[in-house]
């Protein structure tokens, strides 16, 4: 959701890779741009290659770069397959990857909340309003152990990282 970037940035500074549309969103786009977000045209293979090069350069400079390897938004109840393309940047930069799980929890029930979801026909305003008016909404960020890129192939590593993130999820387990 749109809230993922804000929560993860609050938990620790990082640059994000995000779909190009976000830079045109009111307020959130401006904040994402000022945070150094790398924008990607998701339907362009050439643009993915460009972003991988920028990510590699940022990682080699010691910057922290965050990606959403599912490549799309969902209701958050299940974990979608991870795309491997952007993981190549960590392999090329010889940079470890830190698996991170982000969940929105209804603190009253302890269950996963779908309040912040922004999918389908919903508008951004509807999602923001629902998030702001949901009582007891709590963001939980869980960190795994850093994983070295040494000897990794990006597709296999993407599947392993997905398993690591699934294990970090507190409300849904393997997702």
Question: What are the residue ranges of the model-derived segments?
Answer:
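Aromatic/hydrophobic pocket-lining residues that form π-stacking "cages" and hydrophobic walls in ligand
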Residues: 54-55, 86
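C-terminal alpha-helix
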Residues: 163-171
